[in-house]
């Protein structure tokens, strides 16, 4: 078997279909996963997104699992957080076939243990890779069986039990599904009729009985070729249509989902982006109101405003490395009720510590509807500093460039460092930046925060001059 290091990433398995990933290889991964989880579970739940290659790859994985004597529950088309719901509610390990926001030629597998517990490099992925590279041992016993189960309705009902959407003022909300799985889950969560799900371009939308929302749908047709734009709302180019539609129809807010709908991105009534850090703080405050004094997780790239706001509301902020496996592990250790990342991943204890963009979006809409101010004014409470967003630089030697930055700033009075994840530099005027290597590409990722936009630009320019010099 060829070296699989190119497709086994830090948190999932991902590559170009037909070149790096195909059905025979995926079958081997299914068999290896069955061996990994066999001591703990007799069944595996499998879902897939709308990519052309996903149903076939999911079937191949299921064949590999059953070849080792374990049973399979197929839930069919699903968002990643819907798969996590199935894993959590059934207490089964799971496999989700998706490449998230990557282009159509890609596909991959997100894996979890029972209860939606993460599988990453240190919690099973490295072992899976080794098993497949060495050759999966044959199983001589009876093969497992395959059953099908639709969990979409139960998933929607579970989310609506966590956030009450029925009591607020009536809102008009534009939702851009990006031709991804949000087009599958949003209609059921919000109870939209079949007729209202088409992208008519009209401003009327659909109001669900008991829910005060007019939903204006954009790009709800499931299409893994992403004909309208990439399903990555963190790229500003991919929310231009959403911003324009919000302004056109006079909506109260806009929500965009990525390809597998585990992340959400929000724009306000002006069409202006709301930072994921502000969403993290807003949801944290809502969760702390229910359970005062609880722990909130934030990764080291989220705004410093997040831990400040958490403390002001009686919570305990805990800072972690970037990545879902670190967030989920820290939530388990601390008993945290909620966690947020700069990348618009939001994690909830009551959702098996898994990330769900849908639940975060529901919190934002509930908060908006419970008061009379526009979203821009509501979220201004949670936005304290200016930020650069993530800036990538291609470099020949990541470590050498990191050390050059550290050496430059290390001579300055009052500057402090930490290396929890890459290099974080804290300046005496309150500005700070993080510079960290990509796990999969020859990139350094820079995030800068400071008091205002001018200070952010000056600090960004200074760091990039060293990184790219």
Residue ranges and their predicted role:
Residues 41-49, 172-174, 294-300, 337:
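Short glycine-rich phosphate-binding loop at a beta-alpha junction
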Residues 72-81, 273-276, 298-299, 320-321:
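Active-site nucleophile and cofactor-binding loops and adjacent substrate-binding regions
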């Amino acid at each position: 078997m060829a070296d699989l290091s190119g497709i086994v990433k830090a948190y999932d398995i991902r590559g170009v279909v037909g070149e790096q990933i195909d059905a025979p290889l995926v079958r081997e991964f299914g068999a290896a996963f069955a061996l990994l989880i066999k001591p703990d579970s007799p069944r595996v739940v499998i879902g897939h997104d709308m990519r052309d290659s996903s149903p076939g790859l999911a079937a191949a994985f299921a064949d590999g699992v059953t070849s080792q004597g374990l049973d399979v529950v197929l839930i069919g088309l699903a968002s990643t957080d819907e798969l996590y719901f199935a894993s959590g509610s059934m207490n089964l390990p799971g496999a989700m076939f998706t490449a998230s926001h990557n282009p159509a030629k890609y596909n991959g597998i997100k894996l979890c243990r029972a209860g939606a517990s993460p599988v990453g490099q240190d919690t099973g992925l490295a072992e899976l890779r080794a098993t497949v590279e060495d050759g999966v041992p044959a199983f001589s016993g009876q093969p497992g069986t395959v059953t099908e189960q639709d969990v979409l309705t139960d998933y929607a009902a579970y989310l609506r039990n966590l956030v009450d959407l029925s009591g607020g003022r009536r809102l008009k909300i534009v939702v851009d599904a990006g031709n991804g799985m949000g087009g599958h889950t949003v209609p059921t969560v919000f109870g939209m009729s079949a007729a209202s799900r088409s992208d008519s371009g009209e401003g009327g939308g659909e109001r669900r009985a008991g829910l005060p929302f007019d939903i204006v749908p954009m790009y709800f047709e499931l299409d893994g070729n992403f004909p309208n734009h990439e399903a990555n709302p963190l790229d500003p180019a991919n929310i231009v249509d959403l911003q324009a539609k919000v302004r056109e129809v006079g909506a109260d807010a806009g929500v965009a989902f990525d390809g597998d709908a585990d992340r959400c991105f929000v724009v306000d009534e002006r069409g202006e982006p709301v930072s994921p850090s502000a969403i993290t703080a807003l949801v944290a405050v809502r969760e702390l109101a229910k359970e005062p004094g609880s722990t909130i997780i934030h990764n080291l790239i989220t705004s410093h405003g997040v831990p400040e706001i958490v403390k002001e509301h009686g919570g305990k902020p805990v800072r972690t490395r970037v990545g879902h496996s670190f967030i989920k592990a820290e939530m388990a250790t601390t008993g945290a009720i909620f966690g947020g990342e700069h990348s618009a991943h939001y994690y909830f204890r009551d959702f098996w510590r898994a990330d769900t963009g849908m639940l975060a979006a529901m919190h934002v809409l509930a908060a908006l509807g419970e008061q009379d101010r526009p979203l821009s004014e509501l979220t201004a409470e949670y936005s304290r500093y200016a930020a650069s967003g993530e800036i990538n630089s291609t470099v020949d030697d990541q470590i050498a460039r990191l050390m050059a930055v550290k050496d430059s700033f290390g001579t300055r009075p009052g500057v402090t460092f930490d290396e929890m994840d890459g290099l974080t530099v804290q300046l005496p005027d309150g500005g700070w930046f993080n510079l960290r290597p990509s796990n999969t590409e020859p990139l350094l990722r820079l995030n800068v925060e400071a008091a205002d936009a001018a200070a952010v630009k000056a600090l960004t320019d200074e760091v990039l001059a060293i990184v790219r010099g």
